[in-house]
Amino acid sequence: MANNKLAIIGGSGLYDVEDFKNRELLDLDTPWGKPSDQILKTNYNSKEVYFLPRHGKGHFISPSNINFRANIDALKQLGVTDIVSVSAVGSLKEDLPPGKFVIIDQFIDRTFTRNKTFFDDEIVAHVSMAHPTSSGLMDACEEAIRKAEINYQKGGTYVVMEGPQFSTLAESNLYRSWSADVIGMTNMPEAKLAREAEIRYASCLLYT
């Protein structure tokens, strides 16, 4: 556990973490192209931490155009073992008000234009997605959120739509009938690729 390396992938509205000191910006290349932006390397509580803005600083990359494979591959190159993904989402339930956090444990992937695997050329592999998030990493996120006295929910299902348009009313009602909790555009195929790269993954979402 002492050799764990954490990366935070920031979503809409989270493009930097100013509290991180001793900052170094890393410009990486991958076989899949460039990641969304430079990766911030820093130390927090004497631990090495990395930060990557999913949409690029200034939010110039739309969800469908994010190079998810390059993002995950770049973090793998850095030896990252754990990813905490932070995203803004919409609520599908009346009892989940704006400002509440949820630590998601399941996904429904409704995207259809994105490259979703590292294994589509020369090598074929099939990984289990039954449990796409790490229970241990979820527990760590819960502890941090609880210490900050933030309203949260642990567990839930995230519908990931293609975007950039929002869902129709009929689509939202369909997702509610599936018992989904939230809807957004960014955690797929990110979670699948992290799984293929053998990086533990947890998703902390903010209802907006």
PLM segments and residue spans:
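Conserved small/polar residues in nucleotide/adenosyl-binding loops
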Residues: 207-208
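Generic non-transmembrane alpha-helical segments
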Residues: 136, 140-151
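Polyanion-binding loop/helix "lid" in catalytic or ligand-binding cores
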Residues: 122-133, 162, 169
